[in-house]
């Protein structure tokens, strides 16, 4: 009698958990890809942990009756490693709707990943899309800062060059004007020494020179 | 009291200026493409022949003219014959067009350089879509590097008709690029002479570092083998290479590559040489510069092909990994049982054991081939900004390699810009009318300001399409015509014997028969044939088309140019080529009017 009941129970379990059954999800693990040499083998103890994590995620949803590990059913475990699971209600006759299981798993996804040392890509729940991490949002993008720095350096360098150019040309102007003044004075002297009668700019008459001339010419 | 013409501090500055002008982006992004397309290693044969027959003589000619006349392009050609002042004006117009669009590449270089200081590199990951469950659709359809280039950098519109708004980020980078150029040319040869030490030498440092990194990358040898023996096995590739040598297009492309790579006809070389002492040995310098330019092209293509090899190997292995994952998941095989080595036999095994399931999965299985990954020949901005950045994102410490690479691109670009702006500024500062009213700094500032303002067109959403128009049509035909007129003018109008005695008096070196034969005969014939080829190519192609980015498909599609774009192309070509006959006509009319004025008095 008892084993008839047992058969009935497992038969009903088998009906509840089937590939492609209503409210069932397929899980796929890539342990070797994720951990390489440190990969662990998938055995019934790991399955127990998985069922515990699923029960834990269901319990985290508020205002629900507590799910036990026994309510989580696994089936069709392959070499891949992949399997299907369903979560049943306490009476073990019906399965919890997929939407509820989905939101529960999504909420605790990180904890489940960490329990198995895997991540979203190596522990896949097919039909449960993972929330991708948003990009780090900086208030000021990095590139503007670097742009600002280089921009300021270039502006400063240009202003330095332009200002030094202006200063140099001013210095040249004052130098050339001094040179022109002294050149003028030289020309002045030359015209006076030649005794230019037209030059009435009132220079000095060199008395010594004049007196020598006067001394010589009468001869 | 006349102001003395500024001069280079030493001949080395002049050589570096010419090198940094000639060695530009074309050496990095055009030569490897041509090499791949026209037979790999065997392309070097027509390339080197054209270098000796066309490149060196024309370079020597321009440098000699500039050094002899001691003036910019307008002044030099006016001295040779007043009817030829149009040639100088045409050079200035072409240089003006070039500097308008060339600095936009530097702006893109700055953009990528500033974005290289992030972890992870922004072009290595796709952004998320609005509800954060997957990646952005455009990014999924294309790749993350293409998405970053077309969407984040250019924000490109679907066609040239939709101009869109100016992208402020790119506009800022363009302003910075022009400020950088202004800083370098501010004081004329005094400042340019110091800057060219950096712009000429630093790219080589980076190329050497990249050579070291590139050759040690995984799969680099695949790329190098492909460069020298394309199309697989040595027997097939040998036949392919011989076929390419017999193809006239190979020789034409080798000739045009040499011609445009040296930057002849823009007036920059004349401008640089005009600041030389007349006794400078420009023959030696011409040979050195042209040899270094070609050697850099070959060196850069070795680096590029090792990077190609790395990228192709990486993509091939990712493709294999995807196939392995697909098969492992479909058949629930043990994780890690399928590897690259046993993939083929496992596929056969699975096909025989589970035929129905295998035929379901079969359409999704991609045929991964290393050959097809290597065969993607890319040139231009696609190579520099998409292919290279894709390879860099897969290297370790990718930020460092990215910074180095874009810094090198900037050095190359700014070095070429120095030559372009010198070609515009030297005639302006030579002219007594302008230089007496405005100091040198103000003239340079005005030129940079005008170019920057016009360059804003290229920062709009359709800017890249206009960039391609300028890149393809602004300089090609006009330059060929300008250099043809230059060569003929020097040999037949000024007189080859007269120029030969000028050079002997200037440098103390006799002109060998080799140069005389090339200047008077071979080079003009070569340019005429290139010109004829280009014209016939334009006429035969009929309507001109361009590549537009389709965001929904994530790839480029071909579209026809609208009429106003064709009008702009026609205007670009006409405005520079028409300067030559219009200049001659103008001088002729002026002289005629003068004679008419003076005749009654006599």
Please annotate each region the language model reported.
Chain B
Residues 58, 102-107, 111-120, 137-140, ...:
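Hydrophobic alpha-helical segments and their helix-loop junctions in multi-pass secondary transporters
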Residues 456-458, 468-491, 511-602:
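A generic transmembrane alpha-helix motif of multi-pass inner-membrane proteins
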Residues 30-44, 58-89, 109-127, 220-229, ...:
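Flexible loop linkers connecting adjacent transmembrane helices
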Residues 1-29, 58-63, 73, 86, ...:
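Membrane-interface "cap" regions at the ends of multi-pass membrane proteins
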Residues 13-49, 60, 180, 185-186, ...:
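Transmembrane helix-boundary motif of multi-pass solute transporters/channels
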Residues 1-10, 193-419, 425-456, 460-461, ...:
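Membrane-embedded translocation segments of transport machinery
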Residues 107, 111-114, 125, 172, ...:
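Membrane-interface loop-to-helix entry segments
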Residues 16-26, 98, 103, 140, ...:
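Hydrophobic, membrane-embedded alpha-helices of multi-pass small-molecule transporters
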């Amino acid at each position: 009698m008892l084993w008839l009941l047992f058969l009935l129970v497992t038969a009903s379990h088998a009906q509840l958990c089937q590939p492609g059954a209503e409210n069932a999800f397929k899980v796929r693990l890539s342990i070797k890809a994720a951990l390489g040499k440190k990969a662990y083998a998938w055995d019934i103890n790991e399955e127990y942990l998985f069922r515990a994590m699923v029960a834990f995620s269901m319990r985290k949803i508020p205002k629900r009756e507590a799910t036990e590990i026994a309510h989580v059913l696994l089936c069709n475990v392959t070499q891949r490693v992949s399997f299907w699971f369903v979560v049943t209600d306490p009476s073990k006759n019906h399965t919890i709707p997929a939407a509820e299981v989905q939101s529960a798993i999504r909420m605790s996804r990180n904890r489940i990943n960490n329990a198995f040392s895997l991540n979203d890509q190596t522990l896949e729940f097919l039909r449960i899309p993972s929330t991708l991490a948003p990009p780090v949002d900086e208030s000021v993008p990095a590139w503007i800062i670097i742009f600002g720095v280089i921009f300021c350096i270039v502006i400063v360098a240009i202003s330095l060059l332009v200002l030094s150019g202006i200063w140099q040309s001013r210095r040249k102007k004052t130098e050339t004007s001094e040179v022109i003044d002294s050149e003028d004075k030289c020309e002045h002297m030359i015209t006076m020494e030649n005794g230019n009668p037209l030059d009435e700019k009132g220079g000095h008459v060199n008395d010594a020179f004049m007196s020598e001339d006067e001394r010589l010419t009468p001869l | 009291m006349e102001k003395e013409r500024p001069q280079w501090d030493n001949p080395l500055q002049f050589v570096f200026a010419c090198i940094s002008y000639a060695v530009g982006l074309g050496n990095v992004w055009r030569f490897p493409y041509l090499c791949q397309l026209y037979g790999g290693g065997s392309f070097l044969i027509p390339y080197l022949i054209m270098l000796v027959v066309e490149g060196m003589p024309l370079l020597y000619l321009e440098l000699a003219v500039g050094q002899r006349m001691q003036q910019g392009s307008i002044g030099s050609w006016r001295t040779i014959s007043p009817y030829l002042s149009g040639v100088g004006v045409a050079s200035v117009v072409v240089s003006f067009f070039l500097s308008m669009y060339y600095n936009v590449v530097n702006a893109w270089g700055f953009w990528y350089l500033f974005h290289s200081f992030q972890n992870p590199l922004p072009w290595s990951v796709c952004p998320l879509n609005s509800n954060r469950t997957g990646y952005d659709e455009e990014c999924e359809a294309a790749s993350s590097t293409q998405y970053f280039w077309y969407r984040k950098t250019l924000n490109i519109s679907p066609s040239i008709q939709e101009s869109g708004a100016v992208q402020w980020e790119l506009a800022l980078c363009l302003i910075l690029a022009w400020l950088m150029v202004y800083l370098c040319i501010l004081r004329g040869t005094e400042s340019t002479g110091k800057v060219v030490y950096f712009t000429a030498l630093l790219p080589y440092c980076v190329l050497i570092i990249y050579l070291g990194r590139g050759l040690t990358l995984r799969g680099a040898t695949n790329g190098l083998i492909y460069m020298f023996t394309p199309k697989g096995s040595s027997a097939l590739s040998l036949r392919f290479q011989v076929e390419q040598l017999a193809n006239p297009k190979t020789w034409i492309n080798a000739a045009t590559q040499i011609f445009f790579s040296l930057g002849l006809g823009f007036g920059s070389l004349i401008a640089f040489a005009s600041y030389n002492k007349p006794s400078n040995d420009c023959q030696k310098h011409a040979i050195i510069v042209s040899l270094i330019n070609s050697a850099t092209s070959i060196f850069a293509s070795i680096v590029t092909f090792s990077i190609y090899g790395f990228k192709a190997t990486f993509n091939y292995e990712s493709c294999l990994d995807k196939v392995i994952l697909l098969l492992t998941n479909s058949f629930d095989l043990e994780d890690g049982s399928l590897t690259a080595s046993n993939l083929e036999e496992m596929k056969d095994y699975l096909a025989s054991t589970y035929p129905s399931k295998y035929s379901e999965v079969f359409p999704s299985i991609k045929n991964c081939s290393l050959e097809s990954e290597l065969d993607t020949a890319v040139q231009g901005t696609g190579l520099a900004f998409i292919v290279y950045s894709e390879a860099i994102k897969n290297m370790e410490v990718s930020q460092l390699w990215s910074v180095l690479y874009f810094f090198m691109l900037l050095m190359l670009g700014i070095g070429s810009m120095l030559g372009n702006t010198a070609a515009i500024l030297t005639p302006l500062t030579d002219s007594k009318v302008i230089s007496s009213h405005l100091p040198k700094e103000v003239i340079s500032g005005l030129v940079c300001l005008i170019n920057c303002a016009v360059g804003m067109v290229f920062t709009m959403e359709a800017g890249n399409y206009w960039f391609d128009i300028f890149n393809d049509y602004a300089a090609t035909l006009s330059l060929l015509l300008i250099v043809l007129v230059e060569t003929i003018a020097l040999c037949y109008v000024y007189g080859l014997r007269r120029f030969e005695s000028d050079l002997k008096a200037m440098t103390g070196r006799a002109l060998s028969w080799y140069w005389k034969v090339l200047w008077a005969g071979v080079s003009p014939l070569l340019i005429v044939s290139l010109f004829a080829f280009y014209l016939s190519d334009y006429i035969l192609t009929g309507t001109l088309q361009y590549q537009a980015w389709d965001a929904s498909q994530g790839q480029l599609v071909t579209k026809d140019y609208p009429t106003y774009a064709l009008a702009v192309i026609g205007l670009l070509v006409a405005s520079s080529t028409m300067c030559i006959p219009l200049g001659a006509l103008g001088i002729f009319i002026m002289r005629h009017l003068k004679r008419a004025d003076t005749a009654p008095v006599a």
